Regions:
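N-terminal assembly/interaction segments in proteins that build large macromolecular machines
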Residues: 1-265
Length: 265
């Protein structure tokens, strides 16, 4: 990772990158040193008034993080702490504002379907309606019906139901999807799960891992540093690369390979 290379445009032109600052010669030199061919597979750039880098695990993970505002050693140290956060917590976005409406809609759709496929997690009034329909329409086996009647007040009820009974509840939930989604209790539960997911995937919303330095989220840590330094600091972007990321590994089926070699099928 390097923050002062000018070649290429947002990772699109590797040839232009290699022609910058003697990088091509450096690759040749390093190849001769270690005896293995080195090549640039991908790259990305971040820009800002201050840029900090962090390499973890001897090169297993590399991070660049940029911010606009002031630039000094204290700010770069703070950004290095943020880079360590990125290495450890693997955020996908800088903030919620960086997620498109289509992506948010997809996340919500997945969250809804995930909830419907786990009936035990549904709000009690909705789950009761599903059980009532399954019982009234005689959709349960005699064994599951008996288990339900005996254990319906047990919080571990689902431990006594068969997989088939759970599948039946899932089918009923999916069939009533529109009504369930319109339910205020369910909608509130979905919103809560969405907020939790966004805190996991958005850097600025994540809980700051260096709680010894600041107890709060990453955005709060940056604001706290800016206040103490009397400076303006606004995170503008980051890059996180992991070793082997994006490389597809060929899966070998040795049983099939041996069968081919011996003429067996």
């Amino acid at each position: 990772l390097a923050s002062d290379l000018n070649g290429g445009a947002n990772g699109e032109d590797i040839e232009a990158l290699l022609a910058t600052n003697g990088l091509s010669d450096l690759l040749v030199e390093k190849t001769a040193t270690i005896g293995e061919k080195l090549s640039v597979r991908r790259f990305a750039k971040v820009t800002g008034d201050a840029v900090a880098s962090y390499i973890h695990g001897g090169g297993r993970i590399g991070v660049l993080v940029a911010a606009d505002g002031a630039s000094n050693d204290a700010i770069k140290e703070a950004l290095t702490n943020v880079a360590m956060q990125i290495a450890a917590m693997s955020p996908e976005y800088l903030s919620k504002d960086c997620i498109s409406d289509d992506e948010l809609a997809k996340m919500k759709s997945i969250t809804i379907d995930s909830s419907l496929n786990k009936p035990e997690s549904l709000p009690k009034p909705i789950l009761k309606n599903l059980f009532d329909k399954a019982v009234n329409d005689k959709l349960f086996s005699d064994e599951d019906l008996a288990a339900y009647e005996e254990q319906k007040n047990n919080k571990f009820l689902f431990n006594f139901l068969s997989d088939k009974a759970v599948e039946t509840l899932v089918e009923l939930a999916m069939a009533s999807k529109a009504d369930i989604v319109a339910n205020k209790i369910f909608a509130g539960a979905v919103d809560g799960r969405m907020k939790k997911q966004l805190k996991e995937v958005c850097l600025l919303e994540q809980a700051f891992v260096r709680s010894d330095l600041y107890d709060g989220d990453v955005a709060g840590y940056i604001a706290d540093v800016a206040k103490k330094l009397g400076a303006s600091i606004k995170a503008t972007g980051f890059i996180r690369y992991a070793k082997g990321e994006g490389i597809e590994k060929k899966e070998e089926n040795y049983a099939e390979e041996i069968a081919k070699m011996t003429g067996n099928k």
